[in-house]
Amino acid sequence: LRMNYNFHEELDDPVNRLLNAMEPGTYLRPHRHLNPDKDEVFILLRGKAAVFIFDEVGNVTESIILSPAEGMYGAEIKAGVWHGMVVLESGSVIYEVKQGPFAPLSADNLAPWSPAAEDKDAADAYIKKLESLLIK
């Protein structure tokens, strides 16, 4: 349901730039980028997706619907902010920029109040819960 194409040549490049092609049902577990601190920018090139911002206990504090058709193209997430994304339209493609070098998310940066990606049923239910919070 998801495929990346990296523009950066090496994972330790100072800036990571990639296309992230995703389909509805893709689970992007809520996370943050601390230690190392990294800001992240999403620019939606096609399709539709929602970015969610969470507080420390998992309450949604903001949702941003990205849709070129509606004139909303991107979102910037500051280092340390809990965030996640739900894909709302087939064929969605996001251009993502984040400081390098690439660092896999540590357990401390995965939201403890969200289901693990390996628990598909719980992840699917969580996606539906987030979708239900959006104003249609």
Question: Can you say where each PLM-predicted feature lies in the sequence?
Answer:
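A generic "binding-loop/recognition-motif" signal
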Residues: P24-T26, L34-D37, V81, S90
